[in-house]
Regions:
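A recurrent flexible, glycine/aromatic-enriched loop bordering the glycosyltransferase active site
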Residues: 21-38, 97-103
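Short, well-ordered alpha-helical scaffold segment located
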Residues: 41-43, 80
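Non-catalytic, C-terminal membrane-associated alpha-helical segments of glycosyltransferases
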Residues: 121-170
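Catalytic core of nucleotide-sugar-dependent glycosyltransferases
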Residues: 91-127, 169
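Conserved donor NDP-sugar-binding/catalytic core segment of glycosyltransferases
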Residues: 1-23
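Acidic donor-binding loop at a coil-to-helix junction in glycosyltransferase catalytic cores
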Residues: 55-62
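Active-site donor/metal-binding and catalytic loop motifs
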Residues: 76-99
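Hydrophobic residues within well-ordered alpha-helices
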Residues: 66-67
Length: 170
């Protein structure tokens, strides 16, 4: 942090047999909590949002809070710190989520949707919705486009509902 004059840095954090793609110091678009260094004074202005607990997005949300404070995140290719995977714990034990038993499963995950609601403009959210629609069309059992659209819309609305429930609790 001192050497580069930046308040937040992340380093290369490979798993076994993963090779380095970026070999230069660059401005990094995301934040990963597993191998980041943050100036202590910034930690008084941001926090982990518990609405993201057990889902995807807690690191990205934390990083957006930093970015909204005007902070840049630098990627440092060195030091290289090996990312070891624990044999148990973390996401290896699947938590029971409030929407797990819903007949219509939300798509995307409500925590992903929450991140989009918090940080994207309405136009960007619509764009994301459209990209996701086309991305999953070929992977669904519905080959009739209208039937797929109607089902997708239900799943999307379910995701928005649960994301707003999470948002209300945060």
């Amino acid at each position: 942090i001192k050497k580069f004059g930046n308040e937040v840095v992340i380093t290369f954090y490979p798993q076994k047999r993963e090779s380095k793609v970026f070999k230069e110091i660059i401005q990094w678009p995301t934040f990963g909590g597993g191998n980041s260094f943050v100036k202590r004074t910034l930690l008084e202005k941001v926090k982990f949002n518990m609405a993201f607990e057990f889902g995807y997005g807690e690191d990205a949300d934390f990083g957006m809070q930093l970015r909204n404070q005007g902070v840049d995140i630098l990627y440092l290719p060195n030091p290289e710190i090996l990312h070891l995977k624990a044999p148990m714990g973390g996401f290896r034990t699947k938590p029971v989520l409030a929407w797990d038993k819903d007949s219509i499963q939300p798509k995307p995950s409500p925590t992903v949707q929450l991140y989009k609601i918090l940080y994207l403009s309405p136009e960007q959210q619509k764009g994301y919705q459209m990209v996701l629609f086309f991305k999953y069309y070929s992977k669904q059992s519905f080959k009739n486009p209208l039937r797929y659209y109607l089902n997708y819309r239900k799943q999307w609305n379910q995701s928005v509902f649960w994301a707003n429930q999470l948002k209300a609790k945060s």
